[in-house]
Swiss-Prot record:
SUPFAM superfamilies attached to this UniProt entry: Retrovirus zinc finger-like domains (SSF57756)
Short name of any one Pfam family annotated for the protein: Zn_ribbon_3CxxC_2
Lineage: Eukaryota, Metazoa, Chordata, Craniata, Vertebrata
Annotated protein name in UniProt: Zinc finger CCHC domain-containing protein 24
A GO term, aspect molecular function: RNA binding
Gene name as annotated: ZCCHC24
Organism field: Homo sapiens (Human)
CCHC-type zinc finger segments: 132-149
Length: 241
């Protein structure tokens, strides 16, 4: 055994890992050839000792025959191959064995399963300037998006959700025609005179005192036949304040 260990350590120090793997494959191939050769050996006669037991009892010329030398070579190569394969595969795997690899993968799976895609904490709302009035409740201290009277996003059909009349801007999604009206109400649309479909405003501003475009719009006759508010009420909607 001391001779085998000396051979193994000297071989491991001389050969590179790739050469060691080739050596292992060659040794395994030699063992397969030896086992195939043993399959064709004749059956021992009755009363004769097995060749393994009679190996040490042979004459010196029999011990030096090619058959016995091949057995010795295959035995030594098999021992070297097993030792080298154990050392190579232990050094090649960072986990040491397949069981350790499976344990490492399971731990990684559990680690990634714990990671959930959570939205970041909502940043505190920015305070508006001191003189800023909310466009919905007309109080100071918050923007319209933080107004307590505002409906949740997606419920209303118009930007404005109050009860006052607004100045709204419209754009027909079919013909792309744009127009403005000083008779815009919350969740009420106007009919496009070209496509005859109901269009909701994409911009609204409550009317306190008309100015700018609102003044010019006030001088025009209100198209009651196109106003959804007038259709719902059944009379001129501007009388409702």
């Amino acid at each position: 055994m001391s001779l085998l260990s000396a051979i193994d350590t000297s071989a491991a120090s001389v050969y590179q890992p790739a050469q060691l793997l080739n050596w292992v494959y060659l040794s395994l191939q030699d063992t397969h050839q030896a086992s195939a050769f043993d399959a064709f050996r004749p059956e021992p006669t009755a009363g004769a000792a097995p060749p393994e037991l009679a190996f040490g009892k042979g004459r010196p010329e029999q011990l030096g025959s090619p058959l016995h030398s091949s057995y010795l070579n295959s035995f030594f190569q098999l021992q070297r191959g097993e030792a080298l394969s154990n050392s190579v595969y232990k050094g090649a795997s960072p986990y040491g064995s397949l069981n350790n690899i499976a344990d490492g993968l399971s731990s990684l799976t559990e680690h990634f399963s714990d990671l959930t895609l959570t939205s970041e904490a909502r940043k505190p709302s920015k305070r508006p300037p001191p003189n800023y009035l909310c466009h919905l409740c007309f109080n100071k201290g918050h923007y319209i998006k933080d107004c307590p009277q505002a409906r949740p996003k997606g419920e209303g059909l118009t930007p404005y959700q109050g009860k006052k009349r607004c100045f709204g801007e419209y754009k027909c999604p079919k013909c792309k025609r744009k127009w403005m009206s000083g008779n815009s109400w919350a969740n009420m649309g106007q009919e496009c005179i070209k496509c005859h479909i109901n269009v909701y405003p994409h911009k609204q501003r409550p009317l306190e005192k008309p100015d700018g475009l609102d003044v010019s719009d006030q001088s025009k006759e209100h198209p009651q036949h196109l106003c959804e508010k007038c259709k719902v009420l059944g009379y001129y909607c501007r009388r409702v304040q």
